A protein has these predicted regions:
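Metallocofactor- and cofactor-centric catalytic cores in central/energy metabolism, strongly enriched
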Residues: 1-182
Length: 183
């Protein structure tokens, strides 16, 4: 028999890592980001198509003007108007959407797009102080696809201007939050 666990080092015996800092984006609230992104989150799958088209236009027409922004991403989900929003397990997707809005790589810039008739309303994913015209856009408030698209582009431009001011800085490893997906 070979003994097991005989060479385990206790934490006080671990060597100092060769690197104790990393270059990241400090946020006013929450953990630091590893990238500088504009994230556009939808409240309903019905808004996903418009948002995905808008993201492609933002990448082509706006992003080149903002060299300090790494990219633009659409965060969509499959939940529609018929979702049982008050079901016992509905808190799981609501919590996921709420948390992704606050992703460290988004630099605190909130951009949520809804259709206007969905059950998953802004107040279910944002605190009251963040439900503003600067952060939330309702597609049904605009007449036609072109107006919707322009409204998204205008909001995105304002967010990109703010994100473009962010710079990487040297941060301690203790400020690096790593998420893992297992299984």
């Amino acid at each position: 028999d070979m003994p097991w666990g005989t060479s385990i080092k206790t934490p006080d015996e671990l060597p100092t890592p060769p690197r104790t800092t990393w270059m990241g984006y400090r946020n006013k609230v929450g953990p630091a980001g590893t990238r500088n992104l504009l994230g556009i989150v939808t409240t309903v799958q019905c808004a996903a198509g418009v948002v995905k088209v808008a993201v492609e236009r933002i990448k082509k027409e706006l992003l080149p003007k903002y060299p300090n922004v790494d990219g633009v991403v659409a965060i969509t989900h499959p939940y529609g108007c018929g979702v049982a929003i008050n079901a016992p397990l509905a808190y799981i997707p609501i919590r996921a959407i709420t948390n992704v809005i606050r992703h460290p790589n988004f630099g605190g810039e909130i951009m949520v797009v809804g259709l206007g008739c969905e059950k998953l309303t802004y107040d279910r994913v944002l605190p009251p102080e963040d439900i503003t015209p600067e952060n939330c856009l309702t597609l049904q408030d605009w007449e036609g696809h072109d107006a919707m698209m322009q409204a998204i582009l205008d909001m995105a431009e304002k967010k990109l201007q703010k994100l473009n001011l962010r710079r990487r800085e040297e941060l301690p490893l203790s400020e690096l939050l790593i998420g893992m997906q297992c299984g």
